[in-house]
Amino acid sequence: MHADPIYTLIIVLLILMIFIDTLMRRRRVAGIISLTSSSILILTIYNLLHHEFSDIIIAKGILLNSGLGFRFLTSNIIFFSLLTLLFILSRLRDPESSGFRLLTPSFVFIALSIISKTLLQNITLLSTGIFLSILYIIFEKSEDKGAIRRALLILGGSVVLILIGAGISLHYCPDLTISGFYLEGGFASFIATLFITIACLTLMGVPFWRNWLPTTRDTSGPLSTLIETMLFIVGASILISIGRAMERTSYIIIVASMIGTLPGAILVLREEKKNIITTMRGTLGAIAGVGVGLGYSATIRGAEIIVITGAVALLLMHIF
């Protein structure tokens, strides 16, 4: 890793966020580690272990895009050890938490994605895992059957906007090669737009969990921390790999994909008028996630500004 002052500042901000979160929200914090700061911090540590920003960092771990080398195995083991430690800490704080059981589908598909050798297959597996986890939790835990209707509205509205985004990206990304697997024409741009939108929806999904699950209405609860941290890491990972593949077209595609989050945000604001702060935090988390993905992919200039802006905004949200 290069000794870049910008990344040093990011790390300092993230560490500061943890202490601020612990001190200012002690009465409501069920665990020591904050969901957003911990997830970004884990990603930062993961990159420090690789000592390079010019390669596909997270893709070597969750989204396997290269050969199995010693450094890959070592850093990947440490990465998942840190993630497991986060789960254990939350579990100790609340022995009754069913976070492990609820997150089982995600773990299964992450494991499958590591075994898989094609980036497209990896993203497909991870995306499928995300949706299965969402459906599993809705049917398993939600007492409000209207949550299913809201989920379908969010996903349905997003699919329509995904198609619009694919049409826009078609003009900027006629062809795309992913890990040697060549995709032609509009199909390539559609696939890329689809999965970036899924990643953005994942990062923007924080407010929805709190509406669907009675156990996560306490936004600082262990189960909420587990779910949101996992979503943040998976969403940022997808953005990192796709950001690398899309290169110059990333700006256009991501802007189009972020449009897909509007139905969900509007729905939350309409049904939960007092939930504006929660929605803002979810939006800021998405901004930070996009910045992390693009910043670590080393393909988009100015991504560091997005990361810092998101980190500062999240820091302010923790204080107020």
Where are these regions (language model features)?
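Short, amphipathic, aromatic/basic-enriched membrane-interface segments that mark the entry/exit
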Residues: 2-5, 87-100, 221-227, 249, ...
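Membrane-interface helix-cap regions at the ends of transmembrane helices
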Residues: 45-53, 168-174, 232-248, 290-300
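Structural signature of hydrophobic alpha-helical transmembrane segments
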Residues: 2-12, 69-82, 119-129, 186-202, ...
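Hydrophobic, membrane-inserted alpha-helices
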Residues: 13-18, 84-87, 103-111, 260-264, ...
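Short hydrophobic alpha-helical membrane-embedded segments
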Residues: 7-12, 94-106, 229-232, 254-256, ...
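Short helix-boundary/re-entrant hairpin motifs in multi-pass inner-membrane proteins
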Residues: 60-61, 67, 147, 190-252, ...
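Alpha-helical multi-pass transmembrane bundles of energy-transducing inner-membrane proteins
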Residues: 23-30, 101-188, 202, 267-320
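Transmembrane helix-loop-helix hairpins at membrane boundaries of multipass inner-membrane proteins
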Residues: 1-8, 18-101, 175-182
